[in-house]
Design a protein with these regions (language model features):
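Phosphopantetheine carrier-protein modules
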Residues: 12-31, 48-59
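Short linear motifs centered on Gly/Pro in flexible linkers and helix caps
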Residues: 7, 32, 61-64
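Two-component histidine kinase catalytic core, primarily the HATPase_c
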Residues: 36
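C-terminal structural segments of small proteins and small subunits
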Residues: 49-75
Length: 76
């Protein structure tokens, strides 16, 4: 799950793969803006056939937060 999410994320950021860790933060470390995040979330919802609630995004700061959130919803 982690590698799949990172693979999707790499389409939205200009950061080398080796600099991305589970603790990498979307805003502070990757400098993603809200449009990037919402577009990425939409793609992940399609790929994982799961809804990521907008209000839940306030609690998803790191890549690991997103992995945990999606894993919980898709049962992985």
């Amino acid at each position: 799950m982690y590698e799949k999410i990172v693979g999707i994320l790499l389409d939205y950021v200009e950061v080398p793969r080796e600099e991305i860790t589970p603790e990498t933060r979307f805003l502070a470390d990757l400098k993603m803006n809200s449009l990037d995040i919402m577009t990425m979330v939409g793609e992940m919802e399609e790929i994982f056939d799961s809804t990521i609630e907008t209000e839940d995004l306030n609690e998803i700061w790191t890549i690991q937060d997103l992995v945990d959130y999606i894993s919980e919803r898709v049962g992985e």
